[in-house]
Amino acid sequence: MLGRFQLGTMQGRLVPKLNGRYQAHPKGYWRDEFNAAAEFELELIEFILDYEDADINPLLNDIPAICSAIAETGVGVESVCADYFMVAPLQRVPRSITVLEKLIDASVQLGVRDIVIPCVDQSSLVDGSDTIAFVNVIQSLAEKANAKEVNLSLETDLAPRPFAELLDRIGSKSVTVNYD
């Protein structure tokens, strides 16, 4: 720890790339990154949930394995980058709501404070009806997140003013901003 700050890394940066991608959940060898992070004296890893192979990601099916890696290395997980929603936007793919509900529950078990929800590229809020649908979905999920003290941190490609307006429309203290 540097003063009051903790240092961490995005998952996939300390191990060989998965399919040529730096930012990806290293399926099959994700535990190796906890060991590498500990060797570099990093304190945190931002876990990733990709759309591809989401069903075998321990965030959705093996929380005890992540807890074990945390206990063995001392490297924590306080944030999750849910890149899953770039491919399956919450406002367009009904199953995504269930996935986010599971992530919120998993967050409580892991001590995760922030789930980053990308609203960029394929999941960009492209028009008014898309935005309305997103607001409706995120408001209901924000209640659950707030009750469990988890933030839903939005990463959007909106300009600052429309982004602020979106946050006002959502109206939840558990919906925050992530600038990448």
Describe the function of each predicted region:
Residues 1-108, 172:
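N-terminal pre-domain/capping segments
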Residues 10-15, 48-50, 82-85, 120-122, ...:
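Active-site beta-loop-alpha junctions enriched in small/polar residues
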Residues 54, 87, 124, 161-162:
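Generic structural signal for helix capping and beta-alpha/helix-loop junctions
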Residues 92-114, 133-148:
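An active-site-proximal structural segment forming one wall of the substrate-binding cleft
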